[in-house]
Amino acid sequence: MFYINIAYIFMDLGMYGYITKTEKLNGMIKSNPEDFIVEEIPFDIKKDDNGKYLIIKARLYDWDTNRFVMYLARHMNISRKRITYAGTKDKRAVTTQYFCINTDRMFSGSINGIEIIEQFRSNDIIKLGDLYGNRFLIKVDYPGDLEKDSSETLKEINEKGGFPNFFGVQRFGSMRSNTHYIGKMIIKGEYEKAADKYLYDDNFDTEEYRINYGKNMDAKNSLKEYPGNLTFERSILGAIASGNKSSAFNALPKNLSIMFVHAFQSYLFNKMLSERMKHVKDLKTVIEGDLLYNIDDYFNPDKKRLIEANRYNLEMLNNLSSMDKIRPVIPLPGFDTRMPDGLQRDIMLKVLEDENVSLQDFKIPGEYSYMSSSGDYRIISAKPINLKFPEKNKLDFILGRGIYATSFLREIIK
């Protein structure tokens, strides 16, 4: 049995330090998909027998969202651009998700590892982010009683404003956590190096076919060796083999290519949050110069207005934060990012300097302009909702959209 040690701090992904001071528990999450169950909590989708869209509620066993969409499009003989969904999910899990398909047909047949729970028609299109959050049911391999032994940590998490809202390991690749390196190469214009890194990374790869590519850089021969299920890698190889190495990422679906840039932004966010935790005692404290969002009961931010903390409103904002009505945010850097002031500005400038990148690097010219990012903002902490332990060492809880269960478990287990 292969195990993933959640306690391991992926320094390489910008996550270091904890907000709690309790002891390490040495727990692990098994890599069996059945030990990590995720179910979307969608916005209301109105059924209409004459609706324009087909809505599928599907349970995916060990399927990456992007790969499933590609297979679903192929199965239904339509363009993948006609399929939308609310959020991407990790491969090593059992996930229940909703997919919206612009087609007048219903789904028929079967796909291995997919259970179609329900399908119906609707006039409501599903867009990225169209969900309240996700419910998780996670089994932890732990020799003791996790509910009892984590009680002090959970109390401290609540008192300190939640757990650090790090982007989890899944953000950086299902199996090879290197997408942030590729994203950095892309924004720096190193497109050929980025393509090579996608195909072979000596920090992760042990498969003979990847090693052979790294040694020989022979795309035509590698097309004979790379397994058929590595569809995206084979698309990159095909582009290189035809002499278009610098343009190779155009062979991927655009939303997948953009995720490389998003991964690098996520890495920068993680580093900035880690640095903030060195200087600020908890995750609910608002300091002068902070930018903030209002949040709902799921810790989902209201992005219509950024609030800036100053000496006149600081006390009020800290009171609101202590009631979980508001939270400081850290930018995901982009070419149009509004910088915070004070300590958080200093941290951001230092991280960008250390990485040798500027905000304008995220405005990508030419054929890859679609990967450009104006930036975004992410709250620094969140709390689990309705946390229960239905069985020994099994956790049942809800998190808002885009919040990683592995980041919550990391703080508990260390």
From Swiss-Prot:
Q: Which GO terms describe its biological process?
A: tRNA pseudouridine synthesis
Entry keyword annotation includes Kinase: no
EC class, as a word, reads isomerase
Catalytic site: 90 (nucleophile)
What is the catalytic activity of this protein? uridine(13) in tRNA = pseudouridine(13) in tRNA
Q: Between which residues do disulfide bridges form?
A: none
Tell me where the signal peptide lies: none
Q: Which domain of life is it from?
A: Archaea
EC numbers, comma separated: 5.4.99.27
Q: Does the record bear Amino-acid biosynthesis in its keywords? A: no
Keywords in alphabetical order: Isomerase, tRNA processing
Q: One GO molecular-function annotation for this sequence?
A: tRNA pseudouridine(13) synthase activity
Q: Where is the TRUD domain?
A: 162-382
Query: Which Pfam families does the entry link to?
Result: TruD
What the protein does comes down to: Could be responsible for synthesis of pseudouridine from uracil-13 in transfer RNAs.
Task: Read off the NCBIfam families from this record.
Answer: tRNA_TruD_broad
Family of the protein in this entry: Belongs to the pseudouridine synthase TruD family.
Q: Which PANTHER family match?
A: PSEUDOURIDYLATE SYNTHASE PUS7L, TRNA PSEUDOURIDINE SYNTHASE D
> Per its record, how is this protein called by name?
Probable tRNA pseudouridine synthase D
Q: Which organism is it from?
A: Picrophilus torridus (strain ATCC 700027 / DSM 9790 / JCM 10055 / NBRC 100828 / KAW 2/3)
